[in-house]
């Protein structure tokens, strides 16, 4: 499995796709971050009149992380289809299947490679909210909880995207299916009227974590969905 992880990361970082994703994500999130920072500075006079004014965690970090979450949902399907569907399309996956590796080892290797790339991406993006510590006091609990929420989001989104990628040999179709499923799960509880839809909603679980609220039900949500879709992907590849 280690060989699959290393080989997948090597192919990913050797391709222009990885660097384009990193550059675009930095550019887009920097734009959002500066927008939230500008808004925070513009309401300083109003905040000074409040007895308990919200800090940078609520007005900058949490909204910035929410923007980052949506960007990740758009990027992860592209990464996953490159690691699985692209290899099926080019035929290089056949070499892995002929190697002394089980389907579980291959899928777990691809999964870990995608997560490692996402963590590298998050490490780069976290520099922006951390830079606020040079000018003001920040709530590190909110910062770390929000970062945990983004990591958990990546674990589930990657598992879903890999499963969608296993359904077809065409990279474009795999990306479209993954985006559709992820955005549906993100917006599934838009009217806030169903407890079942609220539990299924990726948006609700992620938002609580990004706001600094750590609940076991949110962690369980990501764990259940990640394991479920990983098992489905392994079964699909074994067929």
Predicted regions and their residues:
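Terminal transmembrane helical anchor/hairpin motif
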Residues: 35-59, 167, 177-239
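Aromatic- and glycine-rich beta-strand/loop motifs that create alpha-glucan
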Residues: 1-22
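Hydrophobic alpha-helical transmembrane segments of polytopic membrane proteins
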Residues: 145-170, 224-230
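Selective transmembrane-helix segments that form parts of the transport pathway or gating/packing helices
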Residues: 16, 72, 76, 101-131
